[in-house]
Swiss-Prot record:
Species in which this protein is naturally found: Mycolicibacterium vanbaalenii (strain DSM 7251 / JCM 13017 / BCRC 16820 / KCTC 9966 / NRRL B-24157 / PYR-1) (Mycobacterium vanbaalenii)
EC code: 1.3.5.2
Keyword Flavoprotein found: yes
UniProt-annotated binding residues for FMN: 66-70, 90, 143, 176, 212, 240, 264, 293, 314-315
Gene Ontology CC terms, in alphabetical order: cytoplasm; plasma membrane
Subcellular compartments: Cell membrane
Co-factor binding comment: Binds 1 FMN per subunit.
Active-site residues, Swiss-Prot/TrEMBL: 179
Binding, substrate: 70, 115-119, 176, 181, 241-242
Pfam families, per database record: DHO_dh
Family to which the UniProt record says this protein belongs: Belongs to the dihydroorotate dehydrogenase family. Type 2 subfamily.
Protein name, UniProt field: Dihydroorotate dehydrogenase (quinone)
């Protein structure tokens, strides 16, 4: 059924249909009786899927990745739609419009998206107000980025301001230094640049702090960031963001679309490689959140047994529809029982042991 609906959706420009569908999801879940009925059908209720991470109970491991709900206006909806948590943002200390449109594109032959949104958001202060006013049935993480006009030498203060405003309201914070759509942002992934940023954020909040990294980093850089995260006492790493690589794409005319990051199956292989490398490096000293190209329960299971405590998806939701999260949750529960695990935490990293 969703395949036919998706065909209709894909006749509309991507950013416009995102706005319409997102508004529809929010409206449909505003009334508590409707939200409860949806949650009974879609939410992860099976106790085998639940785990405690950062001292917070997550009813299921699959969360909505940052980028879908940038300003936290849909936090009431995500639990009822099957997600065990959601990460809002990316938000910046100052409001900004992002890059000019068009800035979001479909790559249908690859079941992928290309975006160069540029951290369009209403600012950390507005998100803080929104989170104060709105309740959620599931944990809400917040992804923070650098304001575009802030020079790199003042990046630490910029991130720290967002952490100050949002830390008390978030289950966890993610420092995003890996989007390809803000000029110079990925340069902040070098250990020399990253150390003062992470230190400033950690000094500003007691909320668990993670860093989100790019799939395009060299293996040595991944190792250095992992070591820095352990040294500074970060809670974990989110791996990975979108890729700038165009290798192996089946959709014609991608180069004509211009720059941007690609999400979905084209990043899956590298995201899994990075996850495995990180787990081999840090083991259970850091929480690893795996994102990038997760489409099926098999994909999700492979990430769990490779070391991910939590998972995220966005592009899979776009292509998979409203039952996508439920299907993955049901598949994970079946695999956990089939392999003799009594809970999700037992399976994390089991393929590496």
């Amino acid at each position: 059924m969703y395949a036919a609906l998706r065909k209709a959706f894909f006749l509309v420009p991507p950013e416009r249909i995102h706005t319409w569908v997102f508004a529809g999801l929010r409206a449909a879940t505003t009334a508590e009786p409707v939200r409860r009925r949806l949650a009974r059908r879609l939410a992860p209720h099976d106790p085998i899927l639940a785990s405690t991470v950062f001292g917070t109970r997550f009813p299921g491991p699959l969360g909505l990745a940052a980028g879908f709900d940038k300003d936290g206006i849909g936090v009431h909806a995500w639990g009822a739609l099957g997600f065990g948590y959601a990460e809002v943002g990316t938000v910046t200390a100052q409001a900004q419009p992002g890059n000019p449109a068009p800035r979001l594109f479909r790559l249908p032959a690859d079941r992928a998206l290309l975006n160069r949104m540029g951290f369009n958001n209403h600012g950390a202060g507005a998100l803080a107000v929104q989170l104060t006013r709105t309740s959620s049935d599931v944990p809400i993480g917040v992804n923070i980025g650098k304001t575009k006009v802030t020079p790199p030498e003042h990046a630490a203060e910029d991130y720290a301001e967002s952490a100050r405003l949002l830390g008390p309201l978030a289950a966890y914070l993610v420092v995003n230094v890996s989007s390809p759509n803000t000029p110079g942002l990925r340069d902040l992934q070098s250990v020399e640049s990253l150390r003062p940023i992470l230190s400033a954020v950690l000094a500003e909040t007691s909320t668990p702090v993670l860093v989100k990294i790019a799939p395009d980093l060299a293996d040595q850089d991944i190792d250095e960031i992992a070591d820095l995260a352990v040294e500074l006492g970060l809670a974990g790493i989110v791996a990975t963001n979108t890729t700038i690589s165009r290798a192996g794409l089946a959709t014609p005319g991608v180069d004509a679309l211009g720059p941007g990051g690609i999400s979905g199956p084209p990043v899956a292989r590298r995201a899994l490689e990075v996850l495995r490398r990180l787990y081999a490096r840090v083991g259970d000293r850091l929480v690893l959140i795996s994102v990038g190209g997760i489409e099926t329960a098999d994909d999700a299971w492979e990430r769990i047994v490779s070391g991910a405590s939590l998972l995220q998806g966005y592009t899979g939701f776009v292509y998979g529809g409203g039952l996508w999260a439920k299907d993955i949750n049901d598949g994970l529960a079946a695999r956990l029982r089939g392999h003799g695990f009594s809970g999700l935490a037992e399976a994390v990293g089991s393929a590496a042991r």
